[in-house]
From Swiss-Prot:
Changing D130A: Loss of enzymatic activity. Pfam families: NADAR. This is N-glycosidase YbiA. It catalyses: 2,5-diamino-6-hydroxy-4-(5-phosphoribosylamino)-pyrimidine + H2O = 2,5,6-triamino-4-hydroxypyrimidine + D-ribose 5-phosphate; 5-amino-6-(5-phospho-D-ribosylamino)uracil + H2O = 5,6-diaminouracil + D-ribose 5-phosphate. Disruption phenotype: Strongly represses cell swarming but no effect on cell swimming. Cells lacking this gene show significantly reduced FAD and FMN levels (both by 13%). Gene3D superfamilies: YbiA-like (1.10.357.40). The lineage of its organism: Bacteria, Pseudomonadati, Pseudomonadota, Gammaproteobacteria, Enterobacterales. GO terms for molecular function: hydrolase activity, hydrolyzing N-glycosyl compounds. Its EC number is 3.2.2.-. Belongs to the YbiA family. Keywords: Glycosidase, Hydrolase. GO terms for biological process: bacterial-type flagellum-dependent swarming motility; carbohydrate derivative metabolic process; nucleobase-containing small molecule catabolic process; riboflavin biosynthetic process.
Length: 160
């Protein structure tokens, strides 16, 4: 999937970059964006597939999530509470997200360039659907995905 070249060359005029839908200008930052990642020897269709699968210890169910056709289906499977969540999920979910994001932005040079080009803007997953990973739609959410992307951006700039 090509990154829109005009975004990479875009001179940052705003201090906040909102993203959410994969069709938005910065939609490639979404975990639903169709950028495959390779983690621990397996290829995942999206970072959403990887993240949702890591909620479970059942290897068979994790593999089912990896093989589904869309990130929306993977997200739905990740919310299935008939399957037991791993007990330490709340304490490891940000670590899992960091691993997914690092894989995504290290394995796709054009995405890495896009992320680096956003500095020093604040990145915000702008959605009413999530007040933990996003801003809750009103700016009062935790925006953890945005903060993890900014953290990764800093690390990649140092490693450059």
């Amino acid at each position: 999937m090509p990154v829109r070249a005009q975004r990479i060359q875009h001179v940052m005029q705003d201090t906040i970059i909102n993203f959410y839908s994969t069709s938005d200008d910065y939609g490639d930052f979404s975990n639903f964006a169709a950028w495959p990642i390779k983690v621990d020897g397996k290829t995942w269709p999206t970072s959403e597939h990887y993240f949702q699968a890591q909620k479970f210890l059942d290897e068979k169910y994790r593999e089912e999530i990896r093989r589904v056709s869309s990130p929306m289906v993977a997200a739905r499977m990740g919310r299935d509470r008939s399957k037991p969540l791993r007990k330490n999920w709340e304490s490891v979910k940000e670590q899992v997200m960091r691993k997914a994001l690092r894989a995504k932005f290290e394995q796709h040079a054009e995405l890495r360039a896009l992320l680096l080009a956003t500095a020093p803007a604040k990145l915000v997953e702008h959605t009413e659907n999530d007040a933990y990973w996003g801003d809750g739609g009103h700016g009062k959410g935790k925006n953890r995905l945005g903060y993890l992307l900014m953290e990764l951006r800093e690390q990649l700039a140092i490693e450059k």
